[in-house]
Every structure is written in structure tokens, then in C-alpha cells.
């Protein structure tokens, strides 16, 4: 509780503490309180003089004086009567004296009211902070993430490369179906075999085409890849055997029967066998024409076979 000595230095106190110090320091406050408590009607004494309130900040060194005392003039050191009597029946609050000094009293009452209102914490003056209205939830269009399977990429270049490899694999499988007995383990060897097979087919087509046109003599080097005279054995061997044509030798070693058997079972295998021996299939009439078109060798006479291969 603050001290009742009016001459204490109250410069470090707030205006609200200064106000209470002035009210509690008045000598008439205790007398009017005692008279009010002893009254029958429970009010304050009717003859009690009004309290005097000094409005000042407490910074100039003089706070309390007599009711009619003289002090420094000015707003901060003026004494104003403060009516606290409740016998008027006009409700609670400070009572304004009826006699007045004009605008000076009204100004002092306004100052008192303002200082009293500053003592009370104002809660109703602060507006309630409303939470900002939440924006309506709008579903964002999120691009679905494409999850790649194991061993596959989602990059466009990688996808294009994978599609290219798949097309190459499909073409190679198609070639494997066209060329039988091809090596399927080594891709490089398989491609070499396919190239040789295509060359062999082209040779057969050329031979058949020239036989149709009557160029049987020009077909013989293409069929055997060597002159027909070179395919004949030496005139005399160690056993003194007579030479025989090459086609007779091929017929005697079972090549003809093997090719005929493969033609019934697998045409591709028969073609492969002929290709391995540098042979090709042609009509018998074309073979006979090629054979008879070759001039006889002066060193040896080639005896034609009576029963040519069928």
C-alpha cells in the first residue's frame, strides 16, 4: 500500500497510482467515510464537504495542499472538488457540483472521467479477430507419376531405343524362320549364314533364268563355280582307274539320295546341304544340256552315263 505522506516523491509511479494516492491522502475522506457508515440510510453524511482532487502528473514536486491553498497555477496543479456523496440518489459515479465556474468545471470533470476510464482495462474496445475465411478446397491437377517396371526406363530416348531393339529382334526371328538350321546362339554367325543363304538363292534364280533363255553353256561355271573340265579327275590314277565326271562322283557318294530325302522332309535342310557342297538344283534337261555343251577333252574322253540322275 502506498504511503499517506503527501510530500513523498511519486514521480516514478503511474498516473493510476497517483490517483489512488491523492484519494487516500485526503483527510476529509476518512471523516466522510465514518459519517456515512454511522448514518441510518447507509449513505454518506449530508454535510460532508466534497473531496478535492488535484490533477497533476506528480513531476513538479507539489501534490497535495489545502482545500483553498495556493500553489502553482496551471492545469497540473489545480484542485478540483470531487463529489462522492451518494445521498443525491442519482446513481453511482462521480457527482458534479451544481455551482460552477463554467467551462473550467466541465473540463475538469471530463479529465476525471478520462482518467477513471484509463484505470479500467478495456476489453470490449478490441475487436475480435475473426479467422480468415478458408478458401474452398480445389483439387490440384497433379500429373500422375509413371512408375517404370524393373529394367525399363521412362525417358523418351530410352523408350525409343527399347522399341528399336524390339523391332530388330522381331526381324531376326523372322529371318530365323525363313532360313532353317541357322545358328541361333551367335547373332553375328547367324547373319553370315543368312547372307550366304541369300546368295545361294540368287544363284539358283540366275541359273534357272538363263536355262529358260537357252544360255546353258554360260550356266555351267555358275553352277559348279569352276570349269567343268577341272572337275574331272586325272586321266590315270594310282590304281589306273578311268576318270569319271564330277556329277557321277556326287551321285555315287549318296549326295543325291540324301538331298532327295531331305527334300521330302525339310526343303530348307536340303538347300543347306546343297549350299555346303556348292551345288544347286536344276532340271535334268538343263543338266544334260550343260554337260553336252562342253567340248570333249583331247587327253581323255569323258564317257557319258547311260542313266543320268533322276
Swiss-Prot record:
| Keyword terms of this UniProt record | Developmental protein, DNA-binding, Nucleus, Transcription, Transcription regulation
Expression by tissue, per the entry, reads: Expressed constitutively in roots, leaves, stems, and flowers.
Q: Where is the bHLH domain?
A: 152-201
Which SUPFAM superfamilies does the UniProt record give?
A: HLH, helix-loop-helix DNA-binding domain (SSF47459)
Q: Any keyword DNA-binding?
A: yes
Q: Where in the cell is it found?
A: Nucleus
Record field: transmembrane: none
Return the annotated region ranges for Disordered. 124-156, 229-253
Q: Which InterPro entries match?
A: bHLH_dom, HLH_DNA-bd_sf, IND-like
Which Gene Ontology molecular-function terms are recorded? DNA binding; DNA-binding transcription factor activity; protein dimerization activity
Q: Name where it mostly resides.
A: nucleus
User: Which Pfam families does the UniProt record give?
Assistant: HLH
- Output the Gene Ontology cellular-component terms: nucleus
Q: Does the keyword Nucleus apply?
A: yes
One record GO biological process: response to abscisic acid
What is this protein for, i.e. what is its function?
Answer: Required for ovule fertilization.
Instruction: Give the record's subunit note.
Output: Homodimer.
Identification of the protein by name: Transcription factor UNE12
Amino acid at each position: 500500500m502506498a504511503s499517506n505522506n503527501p510530500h513523498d516523491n511519486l514521480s516514478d509511479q503511474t498516473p493510476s497510482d497517483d490517483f489512488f494516492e491523492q484519494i487516500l491522502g485526503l483527510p476529509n475522506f476518512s471523516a466522510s467515510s465514518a459519517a456515512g457508515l454511522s448514518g441510518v440510510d447507509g449513505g454518506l453524511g449530508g454535510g460532508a464537504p466534497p473531496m478535492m482532487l488535484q490533477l497533476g502528473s506528480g513531476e513538479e514536486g507539489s501534490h497535495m495542499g489545502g482545500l483553498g491553498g495556493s500553489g502553482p497555477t496551471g492545469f497540473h496543479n489545480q484542485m478540483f472538488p470531487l463529489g462522492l456523496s451518494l445521498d443525491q440518489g442519482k446513481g453511482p459515479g462521480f457527482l458534479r457540483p451544481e455551482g460552477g465556474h463554467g467551462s473550467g468545471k466541465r473540463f475538469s470533470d471530463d479529465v476525471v472521467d478520462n482518467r477513471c476510464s484509463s484505470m479500467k482495462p478495456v476489453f470490449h474496445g478490441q475487436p475480435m479477430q475473426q479467422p480468415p475465411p478458408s478458401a474452398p478446397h480445389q483439387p490440384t491437377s497433379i500429373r500422375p507419376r509413371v512408375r517404370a517396371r524393373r529394367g525399363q526406363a521412362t525417358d523418351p530416348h530410352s523408350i525409343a531405343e527399347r522399341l528399336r531393339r524390339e523391332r530388330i529382334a522381331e526381324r531376326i526371328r523372322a529371318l530365323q524362320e525363313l532360313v532353317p538350321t541357322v545358328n541361333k546362339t551367335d547373332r553375328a554367325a547367324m547373319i553370315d549364314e543368312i547372307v550366304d543363304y541369300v546368295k545361294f538363292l540368287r544363284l539358283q534364280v540366275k541359273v534357272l533364268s538363263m536355262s529358260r533363255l537357252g544360255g546353258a553353256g554360260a550356266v555351267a561355271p555358275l553352277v559348279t563355280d569352276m570349269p567343268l573340265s577341272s572337275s574331272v579327275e586325272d586321266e590315270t590314277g594310282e590304281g589306273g582307274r578311268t576318270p569319271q565326271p564330277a556329277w557321277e562322283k556326287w551321285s555315287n557318294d549318296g549326295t543325291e539320295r540324301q538331298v532327295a530325302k531331305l527334300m521330302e522332309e525339310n526343303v530348307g535342310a536340303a538347300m543347306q546341304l546343297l549350299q555346303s557342297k556348292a551345288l544347286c538344283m536344276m532340271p535334268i534337261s538343263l543338266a544334260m544340256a550343260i554337260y553336252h555343251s562342253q567340248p570333249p577333252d583331247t587327253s581323255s574322253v569323258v564317257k557319258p552315263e547311260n542313266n543320268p540322275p533322276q
